[in-house]
């Protein structure tokens, strides 16, 4: 199977690459349209700010390429947020617009931001991405912005208030947490995605 990690220039790709390799796949890191469009599975990781990430997406001519993908795509952390419409970061950043939902800064409710560490995730019953993962399994988060619960939410988490922990629209999936740093539950989620 042809597994590709999209080279957005704004992610530490080694941990994602290693996590995929543990399932027996050899992922390529690429931004070449011919490689990306022929992938069976595509990963969209991201760390840092939405502004820097979208600058890289545009500079590397990935905006239309990502939106043209028809194979399963998994956005991770900031990669999930990039699927949204607009981020509140940096006075507002236009995102890919695949999911018609904004990404506001989290309200702290007296809790520290960023939301960092392990938290429980509650998936919708029956979604293939969470098959075999128990309700309330712990995943690892590091973020200060979060997509609200919306019609495309497939899993929720609570940090002062509910937010989207995972999302799906058509072939595009996103997870706010880091599956590659989430132990057995994260490994199972990656396996589920790779075997779709």
From Swiss-Prot:
A GO biological-process term: L-histidine biosynthetic process
Pathway the protein takes part in: Amino-acid biosynthesis; L-histidine biosynthesis; L-histidine from 5-phospho-alpha-D-ribose 1-diphosphate: step 5/9
PROSITE patterns named among the record's database cross-references: GATASE_TYPE_1
Keywords, comma-separated and alphabetical: Amino-acid biosynthesis, Cytoplasm, Glutamine amidotransferase, Histidine biosynthesis, Hydrolase, Lyase
Catalytic site: 77, 178, 180
A matching Pfam family: GATase
Record GO cellular component, one term: imidazoleglycerol-phosphate synthase complex
Catalytic activity: 5-[(5-phospho-1-deoxy-D-ribulos-1-ylimino)methylamino]-1-(5-phospho-beta-D-ribosyl)imidazole-4-carboxamide + L-glutamine = D-erythro-1-(imidazol-4-yl)glycerol 3-phosphate + 5-amino-1-(5-phospho-beta-D-ribosyl)imidazole-4-carboxamide + L-glutamate + H(+); L-glutamine + H2O = L-glutamate + NH4(+)
GO molecular function: glutaminase activity; imidazoleglycerol-phosphate synthase activity; lyase activity
Localization per Swiss-Prot or TrEMBL: Cytoplasm
Keyword Lyase included in the entry's annotation: yes
Activity's dependence on pH: Optimum pH is 6-8.
Entry EC number(s): 4.3.2.10, 3.5.1.2
The organism's place on the tree of life at top rank: Bacteria
Classification via InterPro entries: Class_I_gatase-like (IPR029062), GATASE (IPR017926), Imidazole-glycPsynth_HisH (IPR010139)
Limits of the Glutamine amidotransferase type-1 domain: 2-196
Oligomer status and interactors: Heterodimer of HisH and HisF.
Matches recorded under PANTHER family: IMIDAZOLE GLYCEROL PHOSPHATE SYNTHASE SUBUNIT HISH
HAMAP family: HisH
Function description: IGPS catalyzes the conversion of PRFAR and glutamine to IGP, AICAR and glutamate. The HisH subunit catalyzes the hydrolysis of glutamine to glutamate and ammonia as part of the synthesis of IGP and AICAR. The resulting ammonia molecule is channeled to the active site of HisF.
Protein name according to UniProt: Imidazole glycerol phosphate synthase subunit HisH
Gene: hisH
């Amino acid at each position: 199977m042809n597994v590709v990690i999209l080279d957005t220039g704004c992610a530490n790709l080694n941990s994602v690459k290693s996590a995929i390799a543990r399932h027996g796949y050899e992922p390529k890191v690429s931004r070449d349209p011919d490689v990306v469009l022929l992938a069976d599975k595509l990963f969209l990781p991201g760390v840092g700010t939405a502004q820097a990430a979208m600058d890289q997406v545009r500079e590397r001519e990935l905006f239309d390429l990502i939106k043209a993908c028809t194979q399963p795509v998994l956005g991770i952390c900031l990669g999930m947020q990039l699927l949204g419409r607009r981020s509140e970061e940096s006075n507002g950043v236009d995102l890919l617009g695949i999911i018609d939902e904004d990404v506001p800064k989290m309200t702290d409710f007296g809790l520290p931001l960023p939301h960092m560490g392990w938290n429980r995730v509650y998936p919708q019953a029956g979604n293939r991405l969470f098959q075999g993962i128990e309700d309330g399994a712990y995943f690892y988060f590091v973020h200060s912005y979060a997509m609200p619960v919306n019609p495309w939410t497939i899993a929720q988490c609570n940090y002062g208030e509910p937010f989207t922990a995972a999302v799906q629209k058509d072939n595009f999936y996103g997870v706010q947490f880091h599956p590659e740093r989430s132990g057995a539950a994260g490994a199972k989620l990656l396996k589920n995605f790779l075997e779709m």
